Each structure stands twice: as C-alpha cells, then as structure tokens.
Amino acid sequence: MLPAYRLIFNTMSEAVQNGKPILKRPGVGIGVLVTDSSNPGCVLLGKRKTRVGKGTYQLPGGHIEFGETWEECAQREVMEEAGVRLKNLRFGSVVNSIRLEENYHYVTIFMQGELDRSFSAEPVNLEPEKNEGWTWKRWEDFPPEEQLFLPLANLRQQDFQPFRKS
C-alpha cells in the first residue's frame, strides 16, 4: 500500500487498542434549534467552554444514547443543559462534519422545537463547566461561521432557514 494512502487510511479508520487495530466510527450527535414565541426569529445560543470547539458558539445538544430516538435525545439534552421542555419538536436537517487533523468526525442531526412556556420559564445554564450561558440570538444576526461550532457552521453553510414557512 502506498505510504501516503496508508497514513490517510490510518487517520480516517483505525486506532490501536492493546496493540490491535480497531475501526473508528463517526460520533452521532443531536443539535437542537430551540425557538420561542416571546423571542421571534431567535434561537437559543451558548458558547462552549470544553476542549473540543472551545470558544465557539453552539446550540443545546449532545450525544445520542443507545436506544434513544432523536426526539427523546433532543428533549433530554435541552432539559439537562437549559432546564426547559420543548413542544412541536421536529426534524430540521443533518450535517456530516469532518476535521481529520483534529480527529473529529460527527454526524449531527438537527432537531427544532419551541420552548414550552406552560412548563418552562427562561432557559438557565445548568452546565456552567461546559457552557458560558444561554442567550436568544436572531438567526439572521448570528456570529460569523468561523466563530460557530463546526456542525452549526455546516448547518449555516447549507442555507438552512429555521423560520422559513414550508
């Protein structure tokens, strides 16, 4: 096998555990576009504090758990991170985010839902070690793509419009 090809192959698909190669697979995550009738045209946005994507803007979300539906994951993540419940939860889009030089490959499913004001007040930052805090940000006034967490930047590149009437 050509050395350059082997290097790329190893980077993309193999890791070593106990001296044996193991297949690497992309992670699967959920990003949640939380909207609110009291904040028209806005979504809930936070700023990451963790190593991966530190300092970039993110939506609520995280890893999908084994056996969990997309809807269940979205509800769980926004409850864990912001203490809110959603209504009218639905599929938004999906992105495939790859940065081999950072050993990063995630498929992110974006769900969209409205803040359920019959249950929830304003979102609160329940994971201050991971996020600087939540704020409502107009979709049209988002930070530039280079300041967004990679999956969110990829969603913006798709020209996804969460407030477009279908």
For the regions a protein language model found, what residue spans apply to each?
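Charged phosphate-binding loop/patch that engages nucleotide di/tri-phosphates or the phosphate backbone
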Residues: 152-166
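Unchanged
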Residues: 64-87, 95-151
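Short connector loops at helix/strand junctions that flank enzyme active sites
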Residues: 25-29, 54, 59, 86, ...
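N-terminal mitochondrial targeting presequence
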Residues: 1-10
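Short active-site-proximal "capping" loops at secondary-structure junctions
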Residues: 50-52, 94-97
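Conserved N-terminal beta-strand and adjoining loop/helix that marks the start
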Residues: 16-43, 94, 109-114
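Conserved Nudix-box catalytic region and its N-terminal flanking loop in Nudix hydrolases
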Residues: 40-80
